[in-house]
Amino acid sequence: MARSDYLFTSESVSEGHPDKVCDRISDTVVDAYLAEMPEARLGVETLATTNRIVIAGEVRGPDSVTFQRLEELTRAAIRDIGYEQDGFHWKHADVAIYLHAQSADIAQGVDASGNKDEGAGDQGIMFGYATDETPALMPAPIYYAHKILKDLADARKARIGDAAKLGPDAKSQVTVRYEGGRPVEATQIVLSTQHLDPSLDSAGVRAIVEPYIRAALPKSWVNDRTVWHVNPTGKFVIGGPDGDCGLTGRKIIVDTYGGAAPHGGGAFSGKDPTKVDRSAAYAARYLAKNVVAAGLSRRATIQLAYAIGVSRPLSIYVDLHGTGEVDEGRLEKVLGEILDLSPRGIRTHLGLNKPIYARTSAYGHFGREPDADGGFSWEKTDLVAKLKSALA
């Protein structure tokens, strides 16, 4: 029997976290190629350390995207994040780029030819999840962990009051108490943030960040019982890639559901949408969110599975966690009918062959508002009517 009273914790990291810097750069490269050639293929990895960035991977795209242009875009991304420190500076860091052509063996399995539809770029399993415990249909712990850091980053960049003393690198963690299966309060709040003023101690940093944290959380969630851990080590001046080496694809739980749902293991950033690690995970979230938005369940987990070179998913699995109003087996069949879940079908329906990925690289790929230019299209709830009709 499912528990209804418990504690659950999720963490987030800011755009200035070393791994997120790398995700941002990798997705900036993806966007640069897709802007020039929507059918470009990319698998791009980034490493960042003290004043050094290494970009490597496989690309099939136009020669108009030069390494010089990619270096300029990389520096612009680092500048936007806010790094102007001796150990990591957008202007002075060394940028090395090692991109080469995509393997012909991989391409032949993915490319459409004759009567063969475009195949998946790799094998794998992908999960999507939705829950009605927040307006964004996301789990509360990860949703609010993201919101805390996004609000602090916005204040830092706008140089609002003492928030200007904060640095780009930060982490948050929120423990939420559930009662009757619903989130009711934050029992523990952890916030570690880089600060540019070396004289600041934990109390000084808390004085800056606490108002933003309280504003980010539901009003009744922070009370006299809430335990705070703000910069527990006391000092956090050296941060970002100068403090810890960063790599693309190391924050896959932060990117998704904060541990509240399964993860297939594949990272998103640096990959074009023929890679089902990315596109099918977006499709699974899209389906799960529409199921919950349609009132068919309070929670939904959806798994998709693919094989390299094969266009159709090998399996579709639905778990409504005992909250469903419909038969899960029937819903599995309907989901495969109302949305073409081939790589091409997903890309076409969600409009994924666009330069919309750099913005996904921090504060979560899910639970965001759809953008007018097609960004976060997988967060739309435009399948609700189709779902209800198909299940009527």
Curated annotation (Swiss-Prot):
Keywords: ATP-binding, Cytoplasm, Magnesium, Metal-binding, Nucleotide-binding, One-carbon metabolism, Potassium, Transferase. Belongs to the AdoMet synthase family. Mg(2+) binds at residue 19. Pathway: Amino-acid biosynthesis; S-adenosyl-L-methionine biosynthesis; S-adenosyl-L-methionine from L-methionine: step 1/1. Its cofactor is Mg(2+); K(+). Its EC number is 2.5.1.6. Residues 102-112 are annotated as: Flexible loop. GO terms for cellular component: cytoplasm. One of its GO terms (molecular function) is magnesium ion binding. PROSITE patterns: ADOMET_SYNTHASE_1, ADOMET_SYNTHASE_2. Homotetramer; dimer of dimers. It is an enzyme of class 2 (transferase). It comes from the Bacteria. Catalyzes the formation of S-adenosylmethionine (AdoMet) from methionine and ATP. The overall synthetic reaction is composed of two sequential steps, AdoMet formation and the subsequent tripolyphosphate hydrolysis which occurs prior to release of AdoMet from the enzyme. InterPro entries: ADOMET_SYNTHASE_CS, S-AdoMet_synt_C, S-AdoMet_synt_central, S-AdoMet_synt_N, S-AdoMet_synthetase, S-AdoMet_synthetase_sfam. It catalyses: L-methionine + ATP + H2O = S-adenosyl-L-methionine + phosphate + diphosphate. One of its GO terms (biological process) is S-adenosylmethionine biosynthetic process. This is S-adenosylmethionine synthase.
